[in-house]
Amino acid sequence: MKMIRVVGFAASAAALFAVSPATAHAQAKLDDPTIVAIFDAANTWDIQTGELAAKNGSTKEIRDFGAMLARDHKNVRQQGRDLAKKLGVTPTPPKDFAMAKDHDAAVKSLRAASSKAFDRAFLEHEVAFHKAVLDAVTKTLLPALKNQEARALVTKVAPAFQAHMVAAQNLLDKQIAAR
């Protein structure tokens, strides 16, 4: 049951982000303020899950990975907030931001997991989450972003999201192989 919530969040993220720019615009008014809000939320969510792993991971490797995620995403989130302030953009979340509820359910599920079950659920969540964010960036968010400075920031940080996904997958593979 707990695993379903974590995977459900990732599926929800993938579904929201997998829509075409035209469909997304019609459904969620995907303008720069909305994209800035999504960017901020994605970073905030990974700060939360990273901090949870830094506290609840059963191994030093998981705790260190969680701390690194939280640190990296705090930095990226601040860059986004600084740019939004500079540009005078007020982040405006989509009216029906179902992903926020799904994130809350995923965090609740992770908090309820213990030890190695936590580690695996966390890593599976991180792989799926980063994949969904990367898909969103390339297929939906970048094509819809109008401001060039915002596009440059999103483009600049995308490789870090990729690195996080690969690192999570490597840790997950290592954990599976150890069974």
Task: Indicate where each model-derived feature is located.
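His/Met- and acidic-residue-enriched segments that coordinate or traffic transition-metal cofactors
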Residues: K2-F9, F17-R179
